Amino acid sequence: MKSLQKGFTLIELMIVVAIIGILAAFAIPAYNDYIARTQVSEGVSLADGLKIRIADNLQDGDCTTKGDASTGEVGNEDKGKYALATIEGTPAANLSELKAEEKNGCLVKIEYGKGTSGGSVSALINNTELVLAQLANGSYVKESATVKDKFLPKALKETK
């Protein structure tokens, strides 16, 4: 009577381990890129929240507010978990004459690694920045960046 084989041979187990290792070699860098992209997106969301403040400030003739954040007034920055977004710039002299796609002079500087979580930001974007220029219609275009383009949202990659 023949005995039946029970379990796996050593070579079969080694092949499975090799396949898992190859898959992990591709999956881990892709996952790290995904994490960096989501953290960059948080900074862009912070910039979107500053649009209203910029519009209010422009009513007073400046991009930034003179308010004192320590007294409860809304300041020129917004801090998220991974990034700090700050309003900067000087409004264009002919603000009322600008076309919708022209820059109004106001900038939002997003600094990654300066959020509330501090060191938990991805190493791929830590200590980098993204500067967005606001258009007259309120939307943003990329002005400059030390963040790699592959981490930027698609809408920002297609501009400038």
UniProtKB/Swiss-Prot annotation:
Signal peptide: none annotated. One of its GO terms (cellular component) is membrane. The chain crosses the membrane at residues 8-28. Gene3D superfamilies: Glycoprotein, Type 4 Pilin (3.30.700.10). GO terms for biological process: cell adhesion. It comes from the Bacteria. Keywords: Disulfide bond, Fimbrium, Membrane, Methylation, Transmembrane, Transmembrane helix. Residues 1-7 form a propeptide. It is found in: Fimbrium; Membrane. The modification N-methylphenylalanine is found at residue 8. The keyword Disulfide bond applies. InterPro entries: N_methyl_site, Pilin, Pilin-like, T4P/T2SS_Core. It is a single-pass membrane protein. The keyword Membrane applies. Disulfide bonds join 63-106. Major component of the type IV fimbriae that plays an essential role in twitching motility, natural transformation, and protease secretion. NCBIfam families: IV_pilin_GFxxxE. Belongs to the N-Me-Phe pilin family. The pili are polar flexible filaments of about 5.4 nanometers diameter and 2.5 micrometers average length; they consist of only a single polypeptide chain arranged in a helical configuration of five subunits per turn in the assembled pilus. This is Type IV major fimbrial protein FimA. It comes from Dichelobacter nodosus.
